[in-house]
Amino acid sequence: MRIMGLDVGSKTVGVAISDPLGFTAQGLEIIQINEEQGQFGFDRVKELVDTYKVERFVVGLPKNMNNTSGPRVEASQAYGAKLEEFFGLPVDYQDERLTTVAAERMLIEQADISRNKRKKVIDKLAAQLILQNYLDRKF
């Protein structure tokens, strides 16, 4: 069963996919969106869902450090609800506190990637970390 992990922002969605057995996550790509104009990237998500035969989504919840919910949590939950309605697949949520920080640290310390290049891959890596945390929690 393949699971798709999503790191939802207001302008981009980082996408990751699990292996068929659900043990590991791999970052795929970053989809450009525009929340204000109602463009959620679902055409591209559908292509990926069909290609990888996705059966479930995991959306990151960017909670505050004190475990409270802010406007981005609400936006992520709204995106998840739209996914569920559009695709008819179950949506789970995963706490994503510090995943972007961890992703950036990995890119700086382990890969020594420049700031400009980091911006191009950070959301994809964050989605991978969100999905991997979810998979680790399940097994």
Swiss-Prot record:
One Gene Ontology MF term: nuclease activity
Disulfide pattern: none
Family assignment from sequence similarity: Belongs to the YqgF nuclease family.
Record keywords: Cytoplasm, Hydrolase, Nuclease, Ribosome biogenesis
GO cellular component: cytoplasm
Disruption phenotype: Probably essential, it cannot be disrupted.
Name of this chain's protein: Putative pre-16S rRNA nuclease
Cellular compartment(s): Cytoplasm
Any one biological process term the GO annotation gives: rRNA 5'-end processing
Keyword DNA damage in annotation: no
SUPFAM superfamilies, A to Z: Ribonuclease H-like
Record Pfam families: RuvX
EC number: 3.1.-.-
Function: Could be a nuclease involved in processing of the 5'-end of pre-16S rRNA.
